[in-house]
From Swiss-Prot:
SUPFAM superfamilies: FAD/NAD(P)-binding domain (SSF51905). Gene3D superfamilies: D-Amino Acid Oxidase, subunit A, domain 2, FAD/NAD(P)-binding domain. Keywords: Acetylation, FAD, Flavoprotein, Mitochondrion, Oxidoreductase, Transit peptide. It comes from Pongo abelii. GO terms for molecular function: 2-hydroxyglutarate dehydrogenase activity. This is L-2-hydroxyglutarate dehydrogenase, mitochondrial. The lineage of its organism: Eukaryota, Metazoa, Chordata, Craniata, Vertebrata.
Amino acid sequence: MVPALRYLVGACGRARGGFAGDFPGASGLASGRPRPLCGGSRSASTSSFDIVIVGGGIVGLASARALILRHPSLSIGVLEKEKDLAVHQTGHNSGVIHSGIYYKPESLKAKLCVQGAALLYEYCQQKGISYKQCGKLIVAVEQEEIPRLQALYERGLQNGVQGLRLIQQDDIKKKEPYCRGLMAIDCPHTGIVDYRQVALSFAQDFQDAGGSVLTNFEVKDIEMAKESLSRSIDGMQYPIVIKNIKGEEIRCQYVVTCAGLYSDRISELSGCSPDPRIVSFRGDYLLLKPEKCYLVKGNIYPVPDSRFPFLGVHFTLRMDGSIWLGPNAVLAFKREGYRPFDFSATDVMDIIINRGPAGVRAQALDRDGNLVDDFVFDAGVGDIGNRILHVRNAPSPAATSSIAISGMIADEVQQRFEL
């Protein structure tokens, strides 16, 4: 097993032909592709794959791309419950390419973020995807924040983040004339990108290599096929049945789940542990009015408070030229609930800001109610558990780290499933 991998990650591959049964959103495969691991026919109501990835967000799609490029003979499908890909956490975040400064040295977050940021910049250049390496200031505004800022700087150096500088008030003013601060960390390798555009590019790569993406497929059940229990030929070739809420079925040999906000529930559907549980937090953003955008030149962050799993309310540039302020973090009463029950405008909103969008992010909790800080990957038990890998906790910086995560997933899938 990959040495640093505590539990395990998801995978992907390439589809074995067009979808029978007129499934919505099905994307087929050109003829003449290599033979998959197993032969077998498709009926009008089922399709079969070597590997199925549940979840069409950036981690699932990056993993699908990585596996199909590594194993072009595998039949692999991606299942997504929405009509479009990458519409939840992937499409509702700040769009920041993180440098890797925040995370505990030697943690998966630290390693994968530093690697992933470099890989992401390279990928965007290759694909012509717009991004800006605009940098970031992490600013201490009170004297008591300076020791934490200095410790964060040392952590960044330990993690191998390049170009970090501690700067004083005069240099802060040179970079951000309207920013008040005593000391700051200058992070020149931080950037911004539209992560949904990146995810859709991963999906295009996957499909171009022969993979199939099936949207409007909300998973209701994952179980061993009855034929596999009787050891019939079909049951042995494709022993796992994935059913959706419409009663349609997919058969496969192996499953990788990258279900984001529903990672615990999908795990439980397959008979695996529901822990760690996912608690959803809604984050609301405000938008600087266009005439006030001159106040902010780049990303500006506060010194993070280690008591909380979030980085604090910050100013973030966007690819469209707008500037976001946020997010806050409040308990969401629905896993995909992007609107609060009510909203009261304040005087300051009339002056410099407009109401902005919201996002919902998944935060894992262990059985004792403690926040789970690092990436968590899991495998099940028993016959079905041996054929399933779960991404259980992939919070920020998972988008930045997505290409690096996908490489780890591809390694682990290859080893576990003996591909």
